[in-house]
């Protein structure tokens, strides 16, 4: 039995509220159970120096957590003068994931920065950030298209992510924090709306796993991502 009482293949309730902030070109508040993330997308008419003059666009991301997003207060990273390794890893992951669904030629020589700020954390913050980040990106690109600044849609496929793991010896979908902290195997699956894999992060946290278990987790991830993409489509329709 899962602590939440959910079935093994049951997602937490998902909601996506768009237009959550008024200044950003795209924004949403995504809730996956008790994990809540504010995602905004900002369009800038510049690109990093390494692609300047190439005609290619760029999508990047930044990630952070509010001090009281967790059970005990975390010190703001700004107060220590540097980002932690976990933060850097996650924001690079978000940027990589979102770029996988973008035609950078069609985007043109501009940059879109997706900011993901965790308001409340209960497991799966990077997955919620990727899923909500794509919605914010979609809304920002819609504005570019409406203004005629891009000719064809640069977003070629939705991108979403979900966690899967082995908890109490059973493969489970969309781990919350109590499950994540005790899982024998923990993984994150990032996929496109068409079912292609972008990235898989899997690790043995207390027990090893075999190919059959990996296939079970992949099947759960496909189900979960399908539900998340449906939520993305409904939010951006």
UniProtKB/Swiss-Prot annotation:
Binding positions (phosphate): 86, 124-126
Catalytic activity reported: tRNA(n+1) + phosphate = tRNA(n) + a ribonucleoside 5'-diphosphate
Protein name as catalogued: Ribonuclease PH
A single MF term (Gene Ontology): tRNA nucleotidyltransferase activity
The entry's keywords: Nucleotidyltransferase, RNA-binding, rRNA processing, Transferase, tRNA processing, tRNA-binding
Family: Belongs to the RNase PH family.
Originating organism: Ruegeria pomeroyi (strain ATCC 700808 / DSM 15171 / DSS-3) (Silicibacter pomeroyi)
HAMAP family, per the entry: RNase_PH
Keyword rRNA processing in annotation: yes
